């Protein structure tokens, strides 16, 4: 056996020797990489051990004997061994299905500089410890799960951890690494690190040890935040790729001051305000944001450029791979000079500025409130005008303002000067305003605005409630009574909200404050109100608590105005955050023990809950550090608690109000119901009893003399909008009974669509009829007894006009569940004959329904509008969430692009019954996605890909009867689908869109479809034999050319009577043919 194996392997050795003799010079100079399979290297190792003994185990270079060998095999072995010793680049590949019989040894490679391992098990690799100190690049793919098994243990050598002195490039992409480890400390000279396509969730602190890093690729992982880097690598990193992760912010990139390429595409960035850290990246050249939710914003590029550094955008900047256009450049923020730039201004520049200022007799007015940005805003010297000399008023500056003359000081002296000016400025405020110097703006405006200021004197506290228990008190308006009546609190808020803009002081140039605010907006990404706001209480010194940790070291001032809770920086008085009071939902107070100034004591804690979407703004927690924290907290609570109660009252009013819609102009508005309008069932009750119908409501309103009219067009034809958003998924009917409202104009025919599963209906307060922007007019009824005006004694044939709507309600047994029927609005082209029925049982809410309602998950609108003429654009407009799902999970080829889609009920040949699906067409394929659940939430939860076919494989297209369906047949593999579109205009437009896609294919891939037939009702149609022969004969004798198919519907399940409705003809049969 061994002899046979050696004989079979001899051609391998001789062939490799001849190959290296011909092209070995490319391998020796490093321009080509020697690629070997693991079995080949194992055989070469055995040959070397057989003919050359143990000399291949030596660590250094081995010199071969100079005398000629006896056989050709020994000569070839000596040649190959000599070549491997001088090889600089090696690529070692292991076939996964081939089991390794022994270890893979790389001892012969003495001069190795570049090593690449593909699917090689690390524990089977031997000899890495002899070459690790000279390797310059290392690539491992599909073979490692941790870094330390290669970097620390050197594979199967299991050696001690030593530094890799020359290693500059590490590529560990396409592995199963879940976490980093301390082995990265051994890579002192690393410049390029690629860990893409792994399973890393958090880099923690391990990347901080890489001091020379210039390129970092962590794409296609599960990171939720930007990785932390060391101080040295922060200034050296040039490229950061974080594509396809789970980032919801880019906080941390502002420290990468020399970054040139940033890729955060396909993450979870929601708002453009989260891009504020980009303003400090002055050398950024490439920015990729595609695939994020903010990328789908219609003004994405202009909203992004607001946060990009103007210095970076002015030099060949690429946003999402495209250069900036002239319209994009208009949205760039103005370059605001910073304090550091003003300090670094050269002495010669400042001398020229002073000389020009003196020559033009235009001395600058340096006042107390002048910002540092203003001092450098006039860098360019003015040209002397030839016109009249303007007479200027002299401005007398404060003694502290004369310090601007010493501008030619060194950098350290400039910092001292800035600090000295700030101190003198504070002293002047103290002298002018006394103990209330921190509120100098409010004191200057006291003539215009009445200020609410509360103190803790004994006289004022007589009319207040008892002191607040700060241990576990929670200000929830549902449980706590109002502390201040609306009469006491409302004037203060109205006065504060109606304040006028204060006059600008003579010594305060308004331009400086605006430039400072623009700079703050650029840094924070938040819009600051230029109009000053009046404080409703004294500013409170607090420290913010993040999560459940200790308070932050930076203290801030907490200001409360009529509209905002403002966080102000303690040192520079810069606004950090503005939180709107109208979003304040709840206030909580508690206590915590904290050590301050070597004194451990109990401090009160204030927690504010807001209704923001952003997580970091939903809850703000502060520890009060003022001199009298309890008194300050009490003052804040007296101001904020009426606001919370007012917010809850507004929410209750919105719930009690009725959402109405005008039938004439479709304007939507809110209307508060009077007691005479609410009927016997108040809106507060959680029962499913409904309000009266629109006719009864208008009759009552007319009787009271107060008709409900549209505020836009003054029309009194209004309807009640549904309070709950119903699912767009069809729901199968139950047998409990139905209640309908059918008319000549609204009925379109019908078969019932059955969805994949029954959708639970949310509780409804009233019966509603809705004409909306979608494809249906809906009338909902819930279980209640009929009013006398709408009793069963009326005629069963129901008609409707444009002026009034009469709803027919069936009688309900006690405890019987009711249903509502939703009919599609008739197509404007008049071609739709089959309606889209939706049934949903109206019953009490279950726990799962309540949780679904509380989560407020967004529903999906996947149906094109039928209130206007359809066109191709209706099928191409897709929700960005669905498009992202198609790109990531459905499309099978990289160059596929979405073209159109259609939500339709489908019947597949070979499968029993119909099913709801979404038909998606790209530029190459057609995909059938089955709807498996409620259309709500993530697409992966309710979509399943069934089939996919190439557009070029379409072999037959056929339009169904009356253009209500479309049949498609495919080849390779053979399949047939019948799309039950049930709308003539929708069918025709979708067929036209599909035909256009087929024509856009290359000529060699064009479809084989030559013509598209349309099914007609004739004796060859399969419905023809189903007609009654007697009726056919009698009709022919009477000379009738057409027959009409009538539809009958059971009014009640247990009732024997049948109700006939006037319908349009469903089938027309021409007997003359």
From Swiss-Prot:
It comes from the Eukaryota. Keywords: Cytoplasm, Leucine-rich repeat, Repeat. Residues 515-532 have a biased composition (Acidic residues). PROSITE patterns: LRR (PS51450). LRR repeats lie at residues 166-187, 189-210, 212-233, 236-257, 258-279, 283-304. It is found in: Cytoplasm. Residues 389-409, 455-533, 724-817, 834-859 are annotated as: Disordered. One of its GO terms (biological process) is protein localization. Its main location: cytoplasm. The keyword Cytoplasm applies. Pfam families: LIP1 (PF15904), PH_PLEKHM2 (PF23142), PH_S11IP (PF25357). InterPro entries: Leu-rich_rpt, LIP1_N, LRR_dom_sf. Residues 779-788, 843-859 have a biased composition (Polar residues). GO terms for cellular component: cytoplasm. Belongs to the STK11IP family. This is Serine/threonine-protein kinase 11-interacting protein.
